[in-house]
UniProtKB/Swiss-Prot annotation:
Residues 533-543, 592-601 have a biased composition (Basic residues). This is Zinc finger matrin-type protein 1. Its main location: nucleus. Residues 500-513 have a biased composition (Polar residues). GO terms for molecular function: DNA binding; zinc ion binding. The keyword Ribonucleoprotein does not apply. Residues 496-638 are annotated as: Disordered. Residues 544-556, 571-587 have a biased composition (Basic and acidic residues). Keywords: DNA-binding, Metal-binding, Nucleus, Repeat, Zinc, Zinc-finger. It is found in: Nucleus.
Length: 638
């Protein structure tokens, strides 16, 4: 109890010069500390001691003292006595040479710090732990530890001797546990944490993981599981997406190389002679030269279906979603490309046939047989494209069956549009040939065309100039359509028949002019047909005139019945209004007739025709006025 009271008095700053007399002559650490304090009492007064040793903090050791039991155990301990003796030794030699004192302080300070902790397990300066004495020894000899010592020496050299306080430097030191990520300001707290159960568990986990990480991983799955366990032990979220994405990208890249190698292989087949590739009949087999270049294509597949099934199994075994869309699109594009080449090869081959001699073109009588240009197409086209078809209909039906068997919708519009455009183009050529043919008939003697009695038949000279791709049945259909059009032209007039008398008057002059021009342009063989057509027109006009006369007679009978029921006063007023309107209309009609006569005088080529038209117009004007009068009576209610 005496030693405890002495140490407490000593730490509180109430110790006196005669305290050493009451202490027993033992070699305990508190006694030695009090003796050191007694010897240095002349240098250090009580106020300075009170500042160093307080009830809550020991500045010499840099330890926080929260409870009374902590204060008692700390001040009675050997570590506190060593720190106090070291502190008073340093301050007792304050009047000596500064350089020597600084060097001695650094060495003693390091020794003091290493005395508390085993050097083979922990380096207080570098804050590093060691699992064996050999590793610790190599660390102390190494550059890192030497560099830290040098930095500490430089910091102490820069500071002034009077301002240097080792207890402050010691108190500012922090201790960090990198496994638990915790920092401590005191060495005792750090030691207690290192000896705790929580730290020991984490340390054992980390050591086991480090030992296991040295062995080589048999597969990526084991490596990934190891990595996840380490991250979970550290309390971090494991990131497993980067390796998975890499695998998927590699897989898709490899299978795309397989897909892309096929068109390259076909291009290679086109460049090299055909004999080198006759052994590969199937369109989807890859040649041995290309398979050797691919790193993973060790297996040869009889068809794409087997290869796709193998790929799906591999992807499912790896836990990935098999992507089967890129290969399907590729097949569709290849098929449509093949059929389009077959369709496009037709016009090209026909153009080439026109450029060849006539004897060479005679050997290809059927229009849909494969031409020499089609025989030069690459051999990687589907097997059904090698067949010869008698007509395009058979070829189209075969194509539709193939597309339906593959589960695709057959596209038949591209050939249909081309046919319609070709047909219209051919019809225009046939129509355009007729005036040219007639011009040739006018220029050439008549003897050359005696064999063709029909007026619209085409000569062999013009037929030879047409392209050879026209089928025989097409020409027959066109001739039949032309003859049908001629019959319809003869049966029906080129312009509709007018319904009213005004339209008849307006169109009579144009009909006469057109008839004369048509007579000059047409040949002698067509005169009879046109005369018959004019007779029919005149008969229709007469019918319309008779119907116009019958209508007003019926209307007059109806209006006479109505007159008997009306008043006489109203009759007088209406008759006066009717006469005024009739006079105005007669004036307007006479002015219009004069204007029309002037216009038609310029158009009529001869005087005889003018006289005929005047007579017809006078009759029509009289009929028109009577008709208008009857029409007005019917409207006004007479």
């Amino acid at each position: 109890m005496e030693s405890c009271s002495v140490t407490r008095l000593e730490c509180s700053g109430a110790i006196s010069a005669h305290c050493s007399l009451h202490l027993p002559g033992s070699s305990d650490s508190p006694a030695s500390a009090s003796q050191i304090a007694g010897t240095t009492d002349a240098i250090w007064n009580e106020q300075e001691k009170a500042e160093l040793f307080t009830d809550k903090f020991c500045q010499v050791c840099g330890v926080m003292l929260q409870f009374e039991s902590q204060r008692i155990s700390h001040y009675e301990g050997e570590k506190h006595a060593q720190n106090v003796s070291f502190y008073f030794q340093m301050h007792g030699e304050q009047n000596e040479v500064p350089g020597k004192k600084m060097k001695m302080h650094v060495e003693n300070f390091q020794v003091h710090r290493y005395e508390g902790v085993d050097k083979n397990k922990f380096c207080d300066l570098c804050n590093m732990m060691f699992s064996s004495p050999l590793i610790a020894q190599s660390h102390y000899v190494g550059k890192v530890h030497a560099k830290k010592l040098k930095q500490l020496m430089e910091e102490h050299d820069q500071a002034s001797p009077s301002g240097f306080q080792p207890e402050m430097a010691f108190s500012m030191r922090t201790y960090v546990c990198h496994i638990c990520s915790i920092a401590f300001t005191s060495l005792d707290m750090f030691r207690s944490h290192m000896q705790g159960s929580e730290h020991q568990i984490k340390e054992s986990i980390v050591i086991n993981l480090v030992k296991n990480s040295r062995k080589t991983q048999d597969s990526y799955q084991n490596e990934c599981a190891d990595y996840i366990n380490v991250q979970k032990a550290r309390g971090l979220e494991a990131k497993t997406c980067f390796r998975k994405m890499e695998e998927s990208s590699l897989e898709t890249r490899r299978y795309r190389e397989v897909v892309d190698s096929r068109p390259r292989h076909r291009m290679f087949e086109q460049r090299l002679p055909f004999e080198t590739f006759r052994t590969y009949a199937a369109p989807y087999n890859i040649s041995q030269a290309m398979e050797k270049q691919l790193p993973h294509s060790k297996k040869t597949y009889d068809s794409f279906q087997d290869e796709l099934e193998d790929y799906i199994k591999v992807q499912k075994a790896r836990g990935l979603d098999p992507k089967t869309c890129f290969r399907k699109m590729r097949e569709n594009s290849v098929d449509t490309h093949g059929y389009r080449e077959m369709v496009d090869s037709g016009p090209r081959s026909r153009m080439c046939e026109q450029r060849f001699s006539h004897e060479a073109s005679q050997t290809y009588q059927r229009p849909y047989h494969i031409s020499p240009v089609e025989s030069q197409l690459p051999q990687w086209l589907p097997t059904h494209s090698k067949r010869t078809y008698d007509s395009f209909q058979d070829e189209l039906e075969d194509y539709i069956k193939v597309q339906k068997a593959r589960g695709l919708e057959p596209k038949t519009c591209f050939r249909k549009i081309g046919d319609s455009s070709v047909e219209t183009h051919r019809n225009r050529e046939m129509v355009d040939v007729r005036p040219r043919h007639r011009m040739l008939e006018q220029k050439l003697p008549c003897e050359t065309f005696q064999t063709y009695s029909g007026p619209y038949s085409i000569s062999q000279v013009v037929e030879n100039q047409l392209p050879h791709c026209l089928p025989a049945h097409d020409s027959k259909q066109r001739l039949d359509s032309i003859s049908y059009c001629q019959l319809t032209r003869d049966c029906f007039p080129e312009k509709p028949v007018p319904l009213s008398l005004n339209q008849q008057e307006n169109n009579s002059g144009s009909y006469s002019v057109e008839s004369e021009v048509y007579k000059h342009l047409s040949s002698e063989n067509n005169t009879a047909d046109h005369q018959a057509g004019h007779k029919r027109k005149h008969q229709k006009r007469k019918r319309h005139l008779e119907e116009g006369k019958e209508r007003p007679e019926k209307e007059q009978s109806k209006h006479k019945r109505k007159k008997s029921y009306e008043d006489t006063d109203l009759d007088k007023d209406k008759s006066i209004r009717q006469r005024k309107r009739e006079e105005d209309r007669v004036k307007v009609s006479s002015g219009k007739l004069k204007h029309r006569k002037k216009k038609k005088s310029h158009d009529v080529p001869s005087e005889k025709e003018e006289r005929k038209h005047r007579k017809e117009k006078k009759k029509s004007v009289e009929e028109r006025t009577e008709e208008e009068m009857l029409w007005d009576e019917s409207i006004l209610g007479f």
